[in-house]
């Protein structure tokens, strides 16, 4: 393989979900296209870190200091939906069933990967609860071992706050990922969320 193509394949194959075969196909596809298209793509990728920030309030991606969801006065400020990743916000907001606010933890507790509670945005969540009149916290974490561990940890901490803590209802398969759940299932899951007893956590 030509070194220039090999270099592109190597970089592309480091991306999640892209193996060497797909990276090779993408590299050759880019070569077939108009060079201007490749330059536009390269500029877009280069500008990502210059133009996209984390919302100072919820941690979602945005192009300013605060995201559109946090500044939307029509949203219910009494409910916060806690998610693992910024892309989960887009998925949940796209359902149309949920009209509250969000909070991105930035990951889940994963001891084998060296991720503990201190590496997550749990302290920021507690600060939000102290500074506002939130009545419900929805734990919308992926139903994996790490997601369940994190949900249990957050549930335990929230026992000290006067809030109802709920978890998404069934319909999301164990080990599933919110990013791949269809909107109808996610909407049913939101409507059927169940309260958690924080005193038993």
UniProtKB/Swiss-Prot annotation:
Zinc finger (C4-type): 55-70
GO molecular function: DNA binding; zinc ion binding
The keyword Ribosomal protein appears for this protein: no
Domain Toprim: 78-173
Keywords from the UniProt entry: DNA damage, DNA recombination, DNA repair, Metal-binding, Zinc, Zinc-finger
SMART domains, per the entry: TOPRIM
N-terminal signal peptide: none
Entry annotated with the keyword DNA damage: yes
Top-rank lineage group of the source organism: Bacteria
GO biological process: DNA recombination; DNA repair
InterPro entries named in the record: DNA_Rcmb_RecR (IPR000093), Rcmb_RecR (IPR023627), Rcmb_RecR_Znf (IPR015967), TOPRIM_dom (IPR006171), TOPRIM_RecR (IPR034137)
Gene3D superfamilies xref list: 3.40.1360.10, 6.10.250.240, RecR Domain 1
NCBIfam families reported in the protein's UniProt record: recR
Family: Belongs to the RecR family.
Reported function: May play a role in DNA repair. It seems to be involved in an RecBC-independent recombinational process of DNA repair. It may act with RecF and RecO.
PANTHER family per the UniProt record, alphabetical: RECOMBINATION PROTEIN RECR
Protein name per its UniProtKB record: Recombination protein RecR
Provenance organism: Treponema pallidum (strain Nichols)
Gene responsible for this protein: recR
